Amino acid sequence: MLRSAAITKGTQRSPNRAMLRAVGFGDEDFNKPIIGIANGYSTITPCNIGLNDLARRSEEAARQAGAMPQMFGTITVSDGISMGTEGMKYSLVSREVIADSIETACNAQSMDGVLAIGGCDKNMPGAMIALARMNIPGVFVYGGTIKPGKLADRDLTVVSAFEAVGQHASGKINEEQLTAIEKNACPGAGSCGGMFTANTMSAAIETLGLSLPYSSTMAAEDEEKANSAARSAEVLVDAIKANICPLDLLTKNAFENAISVVMAVGGSTNAVLHLLAIARSAGVDLCIDDFERIRQRVPVICDLKPSGRYVTVDLHKAGGIPQVMKQLLDAGLLHGDCCNVEGKTLRELLKDVPSEPSAEQDVIHPLSKPVYAKGHLAILKGNLASEGCVAKISGIKTPVLTGPARVFESEEACLAAILNNKVKAGDVVVIRNEGPVGGPGMREMLAPTSAIVGADLGDKVALITDGRFSGGTYGLVVGHVAPEAAVGGMIGLVHEGDSITIDADQLLIQLNIENDELERRSSAWKKPQPRYQTGVLGKYARMVSSSSKGAVTDQP
């Protein structure tokens, strides 16, 4: 029996049916599955501006496949627009709001399945958390990647604009050049074009089996993206008939596959946070140490921005995520018996994919010639991060740095110092009280890291924070430091000028002071007053878990 029978069957449900008749149901439609289409459409960001077209195509295809689609809206936050402002504190919060809203709408109306459509970064994990919580048949449709901007012979992304700010501040480009980059960085619809957070998470979801093969790297404006959205609706109707549910797919092995692909494509640090959160909702025992274990055996084989040369549309032309997965599968680095929403195993899905990438491209490298021999997201531990932290070590020349701490209590204070040339080579920049509780909301530090790169300090300065980093960040950056400063973590005890060691080779992050002094500082520490007492940020700060556990808000 369909779950929607709770609102469509029996004489007692006559009032319920009366409401449904008003939105287009006829007598015969009450026997059809009701599919929710969770539409993240918004004109605030290029990431989501094209979603309405995909939603309409999905709606039409679901109806033709014998279902009754019911569309409802969910929110988005544009990280690119809110970046570097107080508004960025709402970004990670929006992941929870999206998950809560999809769960609420689907469960309140007893929907039989859900097709979630999203574009910007938090849309993907928000939808996946909801699918895992509800465990009703579901499919995710990614809005698609933006095409690269062009300026002379350069491919641009939005990160080019952030880095240009630092270049302008250090006198490397003039205002006219800055404006030219600004005007050409984002040429149309789609999510930020490198292997940043949105494209990383879409690749992870394709690997997990809850979106269709090849769909995670398609360009937003190409016809194949709309066709894939329609096909996704058809697959969802079949999944309802076959009772294929998210928890059938979201196994520990599936998460290990997703981590392997994130490493192989050089994906965002945010994947650690989001995969931990999705796994928690799915009841899967995934921990931060699993990322380090997998990193040690999976190389980076894709040469993608932010630290590489190519953008996601180039990856798609080179064979997309299936080509990446085929190499990993053949090398024994993926679990081939994991299934996708079509009911096919990974091994079945990849059987016709070439074992080696085409020699006519160099976006995807063969495993024998990786971009980096090991994964790029290292989990460091030490007295500064007893629960762990995430270091992105792709594109760095110096994996070990010991230097004096430059301590900032906010992103804004740090950015001002960088733009005023007060951060020097050899410094270890510390931005604290930006964690899940302390921020609250764990802002991304793209503005400071881009300014550092723009000032030609990317391989000379380290930056550590209890906040996050954008998927567009590269250099020696360490985020998600846990415990965070606001709950008494050691990062809150660092003084200006203290010696700090970051050793990505030894997986160490260390405050180099005597234990007696550490204990003295710890005893003197007082919990700071919350920055927000009310509203969504106040509520979030009271509920959110440590970043080492995914920064979730529905922990028991």
From Swiss-Prot:
Record: active site: 470 (proton acceptor)
In this chain, [2Fe-2S] cluster is annotated as bound at 47, 120, 192
**Which pathway does the record list?**
Amino-acid biosynthesis; L-isoleucine biosynthesis; L-isoleucine from 2-oxobutanoate: step 3/4; Amino-acid biosynthesis; L-valine biosynthesis; L-valine from pyruvate: step 3/4
Short name of one Pfam family: ILVD_EDD_N
Cofactor binding mode, per the note?
Binds 1 [2Fe-2S] cluster per subunit. This cluster acts as a Lewis acid cofactor.
Q: What class of enzyme is it?
A: lyase
Cofactor(s) listed: [2Fe-2S] cluster; Mg(2+)
Can the keyword Iron-sulfur be found in this entry's annotation? Answer: yes
What does the protein in this record do?
Answer: Functions in the biosynthesis of branched-chain amino acids. Catalyzes the dehydration of (2R,3R)-2,3-dihydroxy-3-methylpentanoate (2,3-dihydroxy-3-methylvalerate) into 2-oxo-3-methylpentanoate (2-oxo-3-methylvalerate) and of (2R)-2,3-dihydroxy-3-methylbutanoate (2,3-dihydroxyisovalerate) into 2-oxo-3-methylbutanoate (2-oxoisovalerate), the penultimate precursor to L-isoleucine and L-valine, respectively.
User: Which protein family is named in the record?
Assistant: Belongs to the IlvD/Edd family.
Protein name (record): Dihydroxy-acid dehydratase
Q: Which organism is it from?
A: Prochlorococcus marinus (strain MIT 9303)
Q: Which gene encodes it?
A: ilvD
